[in-house]
Amino acid sequence: MGSPPAGLLRRFHRAHPKTELDVVTLFDADAAIAAVYTRTIDATFRAVTRPARLLPGGIEAARVLDEPVQLLTGPAHEFAGARAVTPAQLVGHRIWMPGIVPDTEWAAYYAGLAAAFGLAIDRTGPNFGTEPLLETIAGSPELATFVGEQTHIVWPAEYDLRRLAVRDPTPVYPHSLVWCSDNSHPALGTLRDYLASARPSRRDASTWAPAWAQRWVEVSG
């Protein structure tokens, strides 16, 4: 499964091939932000749920990518033949996401999404990874799951899974770049300029994001 921030970095590197990148994965948001603060890393991509006053001094953030959320179903699901669904249509349907870990950014995001639209997002059950989840969704007429539009997933052809757009409004997952304001690494400045030029210039009522994500729309260093 490929992540949207990884895709952003690949596009950045194609545009700036002489810029050296050392990419690491840090699961925990607090650990990643602490690593930025101590200069262990220069920046991190996160969905920033905390207000600025609760971030370490000198830490800044800017929302750089809004990733639309899609519905993934099997061929026997009620919505399998649709091209798009609305959040209102999903009320009463079980959306299974056993990979959600409590106290993480994506847990906060999907809790907010469920509360905003009255959705039944179920994180119970053992999480055996992506492949077993896809296999279960493929064989179920009732279960569906959410995936990011830019999240690359490969499955066997016989699963016949369907990716449906969610509209009116479209939930978007807000990825932000987090960095330290006094970090003068030249590649960091180049990356920030690139992301600022590439990010969407307008967000309107056709999309939805949690209230905490709005804090980072115009924040920059």
Residue ranges of predicted features:
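C-terminal effector-binding regulatory domain of bacterial HTH transcription factors
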Residues: 14-18, 150-159, 168-221
